[in-house]
């Protein structure tokens, strides 16, 4: 199936079949999707929590209490639930970790090439954390790049998913001690197979016309 067909067929799943689980191979593949998403300057300012056990999913679903109970069953019934987290600070230690990993992976022919790459990344990091002081927004944008990549990727695998912002981030952050680890939760994405009760599965997709959202020059 080509990528456009995948985009046309995927949708936000409203109900999951709790009896249908991802295979071990599928579970490994979704982790690979998370790992290899693009990000600005390859900064990768993220962390993921993947819940597949009943206990793990219940911990994530605590964040759906109160005003967000309508999302609780999605988190409990899906085979896997992914919590997308962003770093709360783009620190020098992280930048060093990224460039050292790139070096270990063989991306630099010379030490000078490594230094130039590191300098370029730090230019943009400093632009956001020092000049613009919007590094939190910048890092969140990278996480959302990952979410979009992930949604299309799991759809290409024949899996169903839904991006959820309707949850209590403070509850979720506290449950997993994210603040202490330098992260905050942004999006929760349950993944699995839709239920026969999923009303959204049979509805036509709706998007604004290109004449409204696209300009060609």
Curated annotation (Swiss-Prot):
E.C. designation(s): 1.-.-.-
Origin: domain of life: Bacteria
Any one Gene Ontology BP term: 2,4,6-trinitrotoluene catabolic process
SUPFAM superfamilies for this protein: FMN-dependent nitroreductase-like
GO molecular function: oxidoreductase activity
Annotated GO CC locations: cytosol
Residues involved in FMN binding: 10-14, 71, 165-166, 205-207
A Pfam short name: Nitroreductase
Required cofactor(s): FMN
EC class (word): oxidoreductase
Binding-site list for NAD(+): 14, 41, 71, 74, 107
Alphabetical UniProt keywords: Flavoprotein, FMN, NAD, NADP, Oxidoreductase
InterPro entries: NfsB-like (IPR033878), Nitroreductase (IPR029479), Nitroreductase-like (IPR000415), Nitroreductase/BluB (IPR050627)
Protein family per UniProt: Belongs to the nitroreductase family.
Family annotation (PANTHER family): NADPH NITROREDUCTASE (PTHR23026), OXYGEN-INSENSITIVE NAD(P)H NITROREDUCTASE (PTHR23026:SF125)
Function, in words: Reduction of a variety of nitroaromatic compounds using NADH (and to lesser extent NADPH) as source of reducing equivalents; two electrons are transferred. Capable of reducing nitrofurazone.
Subunit structure comment from the entry: Homodimer.
Name of this protein: Oxygen-insensitive NAD(P)H nitroreductase
């Amino acid at each position: 199936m080509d990528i456009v067909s995948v985009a046309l067929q995927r949708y936000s799943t409203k109900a999951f079949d709790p009896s249908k689980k991802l295979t071990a191979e599928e579970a490994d593949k979704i982790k690979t999707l998370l790992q290899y998403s693009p990000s600005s300057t390859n900064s990768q300012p993220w962390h993921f929590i993947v819940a597949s056990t009943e206990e793990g999913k219940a911990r994530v679903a605590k964040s759906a209490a109160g005003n967000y109970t309508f999302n609780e069953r999605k988190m409990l019934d899906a085979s896997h639930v992914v919590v997308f987290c962003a770093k709360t600070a783009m620190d020098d230690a992280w930048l060093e970790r990224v460039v050292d990993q790139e070096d270990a992976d063989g991306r630099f022919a010379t030490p000078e090439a490594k230094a130039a790459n590191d300098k370029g990344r730090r230019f943009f990091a400093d632009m956001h954390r020092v000049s613009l002081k919007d590094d939190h927004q910048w890092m969140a944008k990278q996480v959302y790049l990952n979410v979009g990549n992930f949604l299309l990727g799991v759809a290409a695998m024949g899996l169903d998913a839904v991006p959820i912002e309707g949850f209590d981030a403070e509850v979720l952050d506290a449950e997993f001690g994210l603040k202490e680890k330098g992260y905050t939760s942004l999006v929760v994405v349950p993944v699995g197979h839709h239920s026969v009760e999923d009303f959204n599965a049979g509805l036509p997709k709706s998007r604004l016309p290109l004449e409204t959202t696209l300009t060609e020059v």
